[in-house]
C-alpha cells in the first residue's frame, strides 16, 4: 500500500481486522519486517497515546523512529500556501516533505487541522 489516508484504503476491512488480531497474538512475529527502515512521525497536534502506540508498533516491526512535533518545539513548519516566509516558521511543509521522504521509508502524520 502506497498511501493510507482512510479506512477504505485497506480494501477488505474484515480481513484487515482478522490479520490485526493474528498479529496481536504474537506482536514480534514480524520483527524483521522493518529492519533498516525508518518511520517519521509528524505531529501537528499532541497525542500521547497515538505517539506511544505508533512508536511501539514500529519498534515491534524492528523499525527506527523519528518524531517531529511541529509547532510545539524548536521545529515550526508553515502550512499556508502563498505566505511570505519572513515569520517564525523557517520551513514550508511543501518543501520539507520531499526531503523527509528521502530520509524516511514511512511517514505518518497526525493533524487535526486542514493542511
Predicted segments with their positions:
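Positively charged, low-complexity intrinsically disordered leader regions
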Residues: 1-48, 52, 56
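Short, mixed-charge, low-aromatic patches
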Residues: 9-11, 76-79, 104-107
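Structural motif
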Residues: 37-40, 63-66, 105-108
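Active-site cofactor/substrate anionic-group-binding motifs, chiefly glycine-
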Residues: 47-94, 99
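A glycine-rich helix N-cap at a beta->alpha junction
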Residues: 96-110
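Conserved small/polar residues in nucleotide/adenosyl-binding loops
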Residues: 113-115
Amino acid at each position: 500500500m502506497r498511501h493510507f489516508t482512510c479506512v477504505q484504503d485497506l480494501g477488505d476491512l474484515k480481513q484487515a481486522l482478522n490479520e490485526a488480531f493474528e498479529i496481536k497474538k504474537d506482536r514480534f512475529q514480524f520483527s524483521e519486517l522493518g529492519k533498516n527502515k525508518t518511520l517519521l512521525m509528524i505531529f501537528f497536534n499532541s497525542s500521547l497515546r497515538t505517539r506511544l502506540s505508533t512508536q511501539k508498533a514500529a519498534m515491534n516491526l524492528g523499525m527506527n523512529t523519528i518524531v517531529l512535533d511541529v509547532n510545539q518545539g524548536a521545529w515550526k513548519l508553515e502550512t499556508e500556501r502563498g505566505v511570505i516566509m519572513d515569520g517564525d516558521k523557517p520551513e514550508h511543509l511543501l518543501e520539507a516533505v520531499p526531503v523527509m521522504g528521502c530520509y524516511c521509508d514511512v511517514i505518518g502524520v497526525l493533524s487535526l487541522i486542514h493542511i
